[in-house]
A protein has these predicted regions:
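A residue-level detector for the "anchor" residue at the start of short, highly conserved motifs
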Residues: 1-186
Length: 186
């Protein structure tokens, strides 16, 4: 059983959509939001999770999450998630190759179609990363705040490393930060 969304509110000044709960329905309905190149957008999902969407990003999400089951969204591009804690259900972000499994945390998930990898940068909390075509026996890589999990499209390997999270999340504030980067990487 799910909470039906009776309406949503669009705030043009803050570029935010806020969904409001009302009555219950039995099936999950999905919306897809595509952010044009050169723009960013913010959306508050029905469970209270806040998502900042970067330029050229697409997200598919349920109008309302089904109670006591995984809260799944599907991402192509880059987004920063501030996940609302819910002990009864995990929050799962799925992309082309990988997925992030969280309970309540803040992280950046990047998976543009033209990249040869996806990466998840954790700023707060804890989360697990695994390949998308996973089976339960596939290893779940746990990352901690200040760490990045990088999933290779070619090999499916997940590499973990320490990073300065501000470099990866500065786009939320409209800034671009470069530190010791080659011109070809920019």
């Amino acid at each position: 059983e799910t909470d039906n969304i009776e309406s949503f509110q669009l705030n043009k000044n803050t570029k935010t959509i806020i969904y409001e709960k009302s009555q219950k329905v039995s099936s999950i309905k999905y919306n897809t939001l595509k952010v044009p190149c050169g723009k960013t957008f913010n959306i508050n999902l029905s469970d209270g999770t806040n998502v900042y969407l970067n330029s050229g990003t697409s997200i598919k999400f349920p109008v309302s999450f089904k109670k006591e089951s995984d809260r799944e969204v599907f991402l192509s591009g880059e987004a920063y998630f501030n996940v609302q804690t819910n002990n009864a259900s995990r929050f799962v972000v799925k992309s082309n190759l990988s997925s992030a499994i969280v309970f309540g945390t803040k992280f950046n998930f990047k998976d543009y179609p033209e990249d040869s990898f996806s990466e998840i940068i954790l700023t707060e909390g804890s989360l697990g990363v695994r390949k998308l075509e996973n089976t339960e026996k596939d290893k779940l890589v746990i990352i901690k705040p200040g760490e990045r999990a990088k999933v290779s499209f070619e090999t499916g390997e997940i590499n973990r490393s320490r990073v300065n999270t501000k470099i990866y999340t500065s786009w939320i504030e409209g800034r671009i930060v470069f530190r010791n980067e080659n011109l070809e990487n920019m």
